[in-house]
Design a protein with these regions (language model features):
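Predominantly a Rossmann-like dinucleotide-binding segment in NAD(P)-dependent oxidoreductases
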Residues: 21-26, 31-142
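Rossmann-fold NAD(P)-binding glycine/threonine-rich loop
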Residues: 4-24
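A short catalytic or substrate-binding loop motif that flags glycine-/basic-rich loops and adjacent residues
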Residues: 96-97, 141-146, 154-155, 169-170
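Active-site beta-strand termini and strand-to-loop segments that position acidic
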Residues: 150-156, 180
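Short glycine/serine/proline-enriched coil/turn segments at secondary-structure junctions
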Residues: 63-65, 168-171
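Aromatic/hydrophobic pocket-lining residues that form π-stacking "cages" and hydrophobic walls in ligand
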Residues: 14, 40, 285
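C-terminal helical cap and adjacent loop that interface with cofactors, partners, or active-site loops
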Residues: 103, 171-179, 186-189, 194-354
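Short catalytic-loop micro-motif centered on adjacent basic/acidic residues
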Residues: 1, 25-29, 161-163
Length: 354
C-alpha cells in the first residue's frame, strides 16, 4: 500500500526514472476509489458545490492493536518497522489516504499546484510510552507527534488541511471534506451534503422539503437522489462487482480494475508519477517546517513548470468499440496464460510425485 516514497530524493528518483524510460508509475492510492469520494468528485466536477476553495483529508487510525504485528528485524527488534519509523521521523508519514482524493477534487497539477505548507504537531506522549513499554528503557526522543496537522496553500488560493494521528484513541477518520462557494460535502464521521434548495434544484434534484437550507445536512432522501444523479461512471461499471469481491469494501478492486483498463486501452492512468511525488513529499516537507519553528516551506514543482498545461482532473475512457477490441484481446491472452499455467502445474505435480 501507500506511500511510494518517503523523502524528496525518492520522489525525484521516481519522477526522473518515469520520464527517462517513458513508463507509467502509478501510486496505488485506493481511497481515491471509495464510493463517497468518487461520487463527490463527480459532483465537484459538475459544479454542484460551486468553486471548491477548501478541502480536508486525514489518516486518523489508532494502531494500538497492530503495532506488534508489523515486520520485525529479528527477535531483538522490540518495536517493529512502523513504530521505529515513527520514532525516528517527524511529519505526516502517511498522508496519501487523506491528500489523494482532495488533490483530485482541486485539480492539482491540472490547473493548480500545491505551493507552500506549514506543519505543526503535538508533543509525543503515546508514542514515547509505546517505546518504553516495549523496550523497558526511557525514550528520550520520539520524533513523530501524537497528532500532526499540515496546512497547504495552492497557487490559486485554495487551502488544504491534512491530519495524521495513529496514536490517540480517536475513531477511524479520513475526514474528506470539500467546502465550496455553493455547497459542502463531508464523509467522516457522518456522510452528508449541505446545499440550499436553490442550489439543489440547480443540480437537477427537486428537494423533498420546502425549507431546505445549507445550515445542516440535507435529508436522507434528498441525499440519495443527489448521489443517484451524480453516481460516478466508474462506480456504475465496477461498483456491484467490487462489493462482491471486496478489498477494503471494494475500492481495492475498483482501483485494480481501472489500472488494468487503462493499460489495456492505452490510456493515461488515473494517477501519475507527479501525483505520487506531490502526495508523498508531505512527509519530508512537514518535517522541515516543524524543525524550523513551523516555518512555511515551498513545494517542489515536480512537473517542471507543466502544472497548468492540463485543465482539470479527468478519468480517461476508451470508446465502446475500442473497449470491445481490447477486451477480446485480453481474453485471448488470459486463455493462453491459463493453458500455459495448467501445463506447467501438471509438470510440477509429476515432479513432486517422484
Amino acid at each position: 500500500e501507500v506511500p511510494s516514497a518517503m523523502d524528496l530524493k525518492e520522489c525525484w528518483a521516481l519522477v526522473n526514472m518515469s520520464e527517462k524510460t517513458r513508463k507509467h508509475c502509478m501510486i496505488l492510492e485506493n481511497c481515491c476509489y471509495d464510493w463517497f469520494e468518487m461520487n463527490t468528485l463527480n459532483m465537484a466536477q459538475q459544479g454542484v458545490f460551486g468553486e471548491v476553495v477548501r478541502a480536508q483529508g486525514a489518516y486518523i487510525h489508532n494502531l494500538e492493536p497492530f503495532w506488534d504485528h508489523y515486520w520485525k528485524n529479528g527477535e531483538n527488534d522490540k518495536l517493529g518497522w512502523r513504530l521505529e519509523y515513527n520514532m525516528k521521523h517527524r511529519g505526516d508519514v502517511y498522508a496519501t489516504h487523506g491528500l489523494g482524493p482532495v488533490a483530485q477534487a482541486l485539480d492539482i497539477h491540472r490547473g493548480d499546484r500545491m505551493k507552500t505548507l506549514v506543519a505543526m504537531d503535538t508533543k509525543s506522549v503515546v508514542g514515547k510510552s509505546l517505546v518504553e513499554e516495549r523496550t523497558g528503557q526511557p525514550c528520550e526522543n520520539f520524533r513523530n507527534g501524537d497528532h500532526t496537522t499540515t496546512l497547504i496553500r495552492t497557487e490559486n488560493g485554495k487551502v488544504i488541511e491534512i491530519q495524521h494521528d495513529v496514536m490517540t484513541p480517536q475513531p477511524y477518520n479520513r475526514l474528506y471534506q470539500l467546502t465550496g462557494t455553493k455547497g459542502f460535502a463531508n464523509k467522516y464521521p457522518i456522510e452528508g451534503y449541505a446545499l440550499d434548495a436553490k442550489q439543489l434544484n440547480a443540480s437537477g434534484v427537486v428537494p423533498e422539503v420546502d425549507n431546505l437550507n445549507s445550515h445542516s445536512f440535507m435529508p436522507k432522501k434528498d441525499m440519495e437522489a443527489l448521489v443517484q444523479k451524480y453516481q460516478h461512471p466508474i462506480l456504475k461499471k465496477y461498483g456491484e462487482m467490487a462489493k462482491e469481491v471486496g478489498g477494503h469494501g471494494g475500492m481495492d478492486f475498483i482501483m485494480d480494475s481501472r489500472l488494468v483498463y487503462c493499460l489495456q486501452n492505452g490510456l493515461p492512468l488515473d494517477m501519475d508519477v507527479y501525483d505520487l511525488a506531490e502526495w508523498c513529499c508531505l512527509a519530508e516537507l512537514g518535517e522541515l517546517s516543524m524543525d524550523n519553528n513551523c516555518a512555511a516551506v515551498a513545494f517542489p514543482d515536480f512537473t517542471r513548470g507543466e502544472w497548468n498545461k492540463v485543465k482539470g482532473y479527468k478519468h480517461a475512457y476508451a470508446s465502446p468499440e475500442d473497449e470491445s477490441v481490447a477486451m477480446e484481446k485480453a481474453k485471448k491472452i488470459t486463455a493462453k496464460l491459463k493453458e500455459k499455467g495448467a501445463v506447467e502445474w501438471a509438470g510440477e505435480a509429476v515432479e513432486n510425485k517422484k
